[in-house]
Amino acid sequence: MEDSEPERKRARADEATAGGSRSEDEDEDDEDYVPYVPLRQRRQLLLQKLLQRRRKGATEEEQQDSGSEPRGDEDDIPLGPQSNVSLLDQHQHLKEKAEARKESAKEKQLKEEEKILESVAEGRALMSVKEMAKGITYDDPIKTSWTPPRYVLSMSEERHERVRKKYHILVEGDGIPPPIKSFKEMKFPAAILRGLKKKGILHPTPIQIQGIPTILSGRDMIGIAFTGSGKTLVFTLPVIMFCLEQEKRLPFSKREGPYGLIICPSRELARQTHGILEYYCRLLQEDSSPLLRCALCIGGMSVKEQMETIRHGVHMMVATPGRLMDLLQKKMVSLDICRYLALDEADRMIDMGFEGDIRTIFSYFKGQRQTLLFSATMPKKIQNFAKSALVKPVTINVGRAGAASLDVIQEVEYVKEEAKMVYLLECLQKTPPPVLIFAEKKADVDAIHEYLLLKGVEAVAIHGGKDQEERTKAIEAFREGKKDVLVATDVASKGLDFPAIQHVINYDMPEEIENYVHRIGRTGRSGNTGIATTFINKACDESVLMDLKALLLEAKQKVPPVLQVLHCGDESMLDIGGERGCAFCGGLGHRITDCPKLEAMQTKQVSNIGRKDYLAHSSMDF
């Protein structure tokens, strides 16, 4: 018994030691233990890691594209004092980094704008369907018999550049003809020189100094100059000379012609241009030159009268797109021998929906023609598109395209909607008559006209809703001084010339800044000074007011307090890529990315989806 007791104690001791060693092993196992993670959870974790890696890679690529180094730990400089780096150096380093980021933002903006311009650019060239279908292209401009005087040709290119710099003439193109500073040196006949003198035109304006020699040389041209700078003479005098040359070589027979064609966007402008051509043709005839016939083809007039001139053979024709297309389709007019085409206020015609009509008119030409485009406002988008119709064109720009005339004093006043009519009478007292009043809506024109008549003011009104006879009588009465005030919509703002006007009143702000430039350009013409008063209020679109503010600053005019408070964010972003403002509409207060005109056009296009009639023009519906 005594022997078994120690054995039992030993066994307990062994169990105790064994238990102790087991607990130590268990502790070690606890330390090495990895908890079990379900398969789904493991997959989610792996996916998260992959996404993080991909994001990191993408941000590095973006930073490389923008030209900045990938941000690492060394970029995260703690703000505050650092060892071996002065606060000035630290400030300079941070400033450089901020400028680098700003530059990348500008580059990004430019890329975005290029994409937008490409998307809105017209895919088809401004050519006839026949020319595009047959792949007809012309490499060389039309040859003419005119050459500059020998001594002008012998002058150096440096001298020509000095003349252009003196008159602020910007030219683009190859083989540009030299600028000529007098009408006599341009080889015009004595009768035309006398006619110019009678009108008080003694020296050519900057656009005429470079433009007339360019056209007489037979070159295609885009002419951009501020309102009242004499653009009409640039394309009317050369066409008279070309037609006179053709008539002397071989007289025009019955139903032949025209040789020269001028297209205008409005009837009033066409009538005015026709009057200028008639004046110089009459002077040439009095000076024993052959009779040159000029036809006026506009809507609202009897076709019979127009055909009477055409039947005898016509040298020149001034027309509006609608009536000209009608006569061409009815085969009453032929453009077989036409070699000279001028589009006055070209950007408005292309922009205002006449583009299809212009293409159709182009398809009636049988050979190469000399094409000229003129306007006071021509955004980059229109210039690029128009160049597709020209052969080695010369672009002549006097001042910025769309800039206001510096001879006009611009006054902008905040007037409540209900107070406009009463304040209008006060504004009429600023200058002696004649005065021109513009309004956007036809109803406003009629209301202003009626109010002025009730107050005893001698006023006339024109807008698209009135018939042609009434419009013509109103303009003639105003031009002759029988009436003191002309109230009109924008139909009278394009190209019309009323020499004595000292004051233009904008009853409302137009929806596009281009129309504002054309409106105020009716005064301050031919070197005279004029005043333009514009009423603005809360109803005006802010983007147009921003453009107006920029236009006033550019012309060094007084900016009213109501416009001074307007800000468009980062002003430096308005002037990037070597061009200020919007490339689509020409406004200075915004870029193409924020253009309200482009936005309105895109909205209209979207709303027209599904409504378009896909039947061809004049086709039968079977």
UniProtKB/Swiss-Prot annotation:
Catalytic activity field: ATP + H2O = ADP + phosphate + H(+)
Record EC number: 3.6.4.13
Region (Disordered): 1-39, 51-84
Enzyme class: hydrolase
Binding site for ATP: A225, F226, T227, G228, S229, G230, K231, T232
Post-translational modification comment from the UniProt entry: Acetylation at Lys-9 regulates the nuclear/cytoplasmic localization. Phosphorylated by BTK; phosphorylation induces binding to dsDNA and STING1.
CCHC-type zinc finger locations on the chain: 580-597
Protein name listed in UniProt: Probable ATP-dependent RNA helicase DDX41
